[in-house]
Amino acid sequence: MAFCALSFPAHISRATTPAPSDLQKSSSFSSRFYWGADLLRPSQYKVRKIQSGVYASLSESGEYHSRRPPTPLLDTINYPIHMKNLSVKELKQLSDELRSDVIFNVSNTGGHLGSSLGVVELTVALHFVFNTPQDRILWDVGHQSYPHKILTGRRDKMHTMRQTNGLAGFTKRSESEYDCFGTGHSSTTISAGLGMAVGRDLKGRKNNVVAVIGDGAMTAGQAYEAMNNAGYLDSDMIIILNDNKQVSLPTASLDGPIPPVGALSSALSRLQSNRPLRELREVAKGVTKQIGGSVHELAAKVDEYARGMISGSGSTLFEELGLYYIGPVDGHNIDDLVSILEEVKSTKTTGPVLIHCITEKGRGYPYAEKAADKYHGVAKFDPATGKQFKGTSNTQSYTTYFAEALVAEAEADKDVVAIHAAMGGGTGLNLFLRRFPTRCFDVGIAEQHAVTFAAGLACEGLKPFCAIYSSFMQRAYDQAIHDVDLQKLPVRFAMDRAGLVGADGPTHCGAFDVTFMACLPNMVVMAPSDEAELFHMVATAAAIDDRPSCFRYPRGNGIGVPLPQGNKGTPLEIGKGRVLVEGERVALLGYGTAVQSCLAAAALVEPHGLRLTVADARFCKPLDHALIRELAKNHEVLITVEEGSIGGFGSHVAQFMALDGLLDGKTKWRPIVLPDRYIDHGSPADQYVDAGLTPPHIAATVFNVLGQTREALKVMTT
């Protein structure tokens, strides 16, 4: 057994427990029972003093160790093929070393820690049993894929995780042939896996398809749509429900309390994967499709009997969807996982199988086990103490400012309510929840439901604020159109993480919200240029009660402008922008926080004898027509600047200018938008350079359009 080269304080260290013996094919059934044990037995950590330090415990001197742990077995594993001859005992050692490696790497890069630690044994078992990449393994969301990446040829690049030109934080098809499906958003893998399974069948292939889903993803309707279709199509595939108590149907509430019973549950699950019982059910299943009458009823009873024998939980939900259910299974028991996966792989059967694995988020790292929410996504941290190294700032995040503004509105108006889709921390609404517990609604990862739920609240005279990340708003677009905008219901959309988002990359980039929201006929579309403006736009949205509205704001902190007194914003005049700096020849019309880059660009240009006009549009819809006319008629060049895709704010300005005849004369218009491609993950600074949205890029555009190419080159190189 390998030991993690990390140490933890005595008050949270694990008790030493004997390691289970290797799986013996000849062992009796009764020998597999551990009466009274918990399904999630404590990790088998113990003090082991060796020459290079103390591992997995507090040292005698009270010192902690945070250097890279020794991983002699993992060092020999570059790809899954290298695991095939390992014994179960060695697989356990590999799991321990893999967990240590994940902790060490994430401590240096930041990233998703808890989810990855929770699937270490499952990852090892999957790659041991199945033959990837021929067999397909899909990781839903993908933030638990770090152990998978380490075992599939990318260990030497883990130090680049989520960094510019480094490994992605999720699975990515272009990164490795072992990443058969790209992820980042939740609840997609059963659908994609089913498509792969049906495609395999149509092509006459024999490979396996495994979809791993959980960690909140089972709260989304798509997962159930896919399971329903999988049961109907009856193609062979394996669905692994990674139940870490953050799914819609956790073990404790699936059909009432179902307490895990440790090795007893493991033994029952091993029995449940017994081939004769499975094949008995398949016979009955086939018969019921071909005959009727009394014989049909008999066959149905055989199927019911087999299913009852097999389903240890007593739940028929998954079976009613047409899935063959096995579980619950201890997701940290290599013996059981390997045995069950091999049985399922080798059994001649037809149709989808669901294996219900019970796992612990943050497994093997006490700090993450005790505070799963705080160690889901982490900054760089000290492995020995769990302390995260978060940057200091004199300002708060836009997310926090939004939450404070909404609390202020709710204090003044009892009809203000808040909705989020399993992102209470990410959207800041946990702050709202603490103040107004009966007026805040977490609907799970169910953005479609969140939007229509908000529409229903609006129908009853409430003032719903639906806080959803910009990229996740994409998942509820039909609801935004059909259930909200078409009916002119006053739902307020607070779209966080607008624009580039850094390490989370293109899956979470909020590039498209202005484009897809501003084309809706009844929608008011706004964006604040700073945190004070955000307070005013929250107040504006609260005051708009005859139609829907939305506002976007970025990841990151405010710029330090004075805030409204008492955190209470003042409603803005709808469709009115403002001029911040009066200049000549060239006007920069910024939208959202891009206004700050416009101001910085104006400062770069001024030493060259050119004073620019800088305006803050505030609204994309309705546009400030008077402001645009003024800027177009009094300047040679109008440049619109936004941190969004083609078809957004600039396109709406161009549409108006063209129809108003403002482009028929000498006035030139130039748009600066995100390029028509996905911006890869990296540091925010690198992403802005890649996108061409830095102040020097804006300044260079000014000089180029004026024909001053030398100045343009100079401003880009200084």
UniProtKB/Swiss-Prot annotation:
Binds 1 Mg(2+) ion per subunit. Thiamine diphosphate binds at H143, G184, H185, S186, G216, A217, N244, Y365, E447. InterPro entries: Dxylulose-5-P_synthase (IPR005477), THDP-binding (IPR029061), Transketo_C/PFOR_II (IPR009014), Transketolase-like_Pyr-bd (IPR005475), Transketolase_BS (IPR020826), Transketolase_C (IPR033248), Transketolase_CS (IPR049557). It catalyses: D-glyceraldehyde 3-phosphate + pyruvate + H(+) = 1-deoxy-D-xylulose 5-phosphate + CO2. SUPFAM superfamilies: Thiamin diphosphate-binding fold (THDP-binding) (SSF52518), TK C-terminal domain-like (SSF52922). GO terms for cellular component: chloroplast. Its cofactor is Mg(2+); thiamine diphosphate. Residues 1-55 form a transit peptide. Mg(2+) binds at D215, N244. The keyword Thylakoid does not apply. Keywords: Chloroplast, Isoprene biosynthesis, Magnesium, Metal-binding, Plastid, Thiamine biosynthesis, Thiamine pyrophosphate, Transferase, Transit peptide. Catalyzes the acyloin condensation reaction between C atoms 2 and 3 of pyruvate and glyceraldehyde 3-phosphate to yield 1-deoxy-D-xylulose-5-phosphate (DXP). Belongs to the transketolase family. DXPS subfamily. This is 1-deoxy-D-xylulose-5-phosphate synthase 1, chloroplastic. It comes from Cannabis sativa.
